[in-house]
């Protein structure tokens, strides 16, 4: 099977920007991503109306402000964001079953499942070269196709942690 971008098994490949549906997550995984960054869609689920005033401290719905008067306008609830992600997960499960995958990890980097002709033949794709994106590196089955080795962070052995432990 093809490996897509997931051959970099010691690194995380993250998809970010414009993720709104479970289908977006599936496409990212098939291209090799093993992490997914959502930002705008959960903000909308919590009540954001996209006024693009976050940096001005004048958010009219009270999400991105420290002004007590504006903060009182916030009517969002954490449950709305949780429900959004439940719907995403449900759609991902549904599409995985349609594609014949039982585990999410099985899907990472399986670019052969994508219908590439529709993308390549689309009028907006005229003149674009997708060969590098859909390249099959012909790696053996012994080569992992997703991030299965976690990084070793030296932060667990820093002096601060030892001092905090001693202070208890």
Place the predicted regions along the sequence by residue:
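Flexible glycine/proline-rich, aromatic-decorated loop/lid segments
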Residues: 3, 30-70
